[in-house]
Amino acid sequence: MSCLPALDKFLQNYHQAYLTSLGELLRYYPQGEASVCIQGEFHADLDQAVSWQPVKREVEGSFANVEHALELTLWPEINHFYGQYFSAPLLFDSEWGTGELLQVWNEDDFTCLQQNLIGHLMMKKKLKQPPTWFIGLLDEGDKMLTINNSDGSVWIELPGEIPTQQLSPSLAEFIGALSPRIAPPVKHEELPMPALEHPGIFASFKRMWQNLFGKR
């Protein structure tokens, strides 16, 4: 079962939750990065939050280059989850705690995602662990949310370790169990690692990647 209907619904609920509770659009700090998601004026030189909303991509994002580089077939849900929309990260509440679902802000962000996904999968191979790919963070970034690439199930994963706690048998069911979390926009800190400087998707991976690199 594709996760796309569940993702569509969550995005609709997410947008509506902010309109209903705050009477305004979603807000996000793009840190100088343009995006079709931005509503209203955008000035790259101004350090301020912008109004935004998710935008369906005209051309679906593809991970064929990642599969080719790693000689690995990825679970097809990766295309539905990351390749359908441009969006800021999505905050959520759940029975497992608070967290965020990662999304891509623009094409540069998508390229950054692919590069870091390759790095993650190469690390899994180096550690002789089954391949996984990340979809988000739990508990303020202390834990990764990952997909088991062999069957599409959702797990909690600590950097450098094999996932031990399954949350859902599918990404569709997992997304369906989440509730939008309303919170003010937070400006992400600059990261010292060049590969992670892009402010869209990987600012949220600060602790995760520091821990991961520390285990090499």
From Swiss-Prot:
UniProt topology in membrane: Peripheral membrane protein
Keyword Ribonucleoprotein: no
Sequence similarity: Belongs to the Syd family.
Listed name of the protein: Protein Syd
Function: Interacts with the SecY protein in vivo. May bind preferentially to an uncomplexed state of SecY, thus functioning either as a chelating agent for excess SecY in the cell or as a regulatory factor that negatively controls the translocase function.
Protein species of origin: Shewanella baltica (strain OS185)
Single GO cellular component term: cytoplasmic side of plasma membrane
Major place of residence: membrane
Subcellular location: Cell inner membrane
Keyword Membrane part of the UniProt annotation: yes
Keywords: Cell inner membrane, Cell membrane, Membrane
InterPro entries the UniProt entry points to: Syd (IPR009948), Syd_sf (IPR038228)
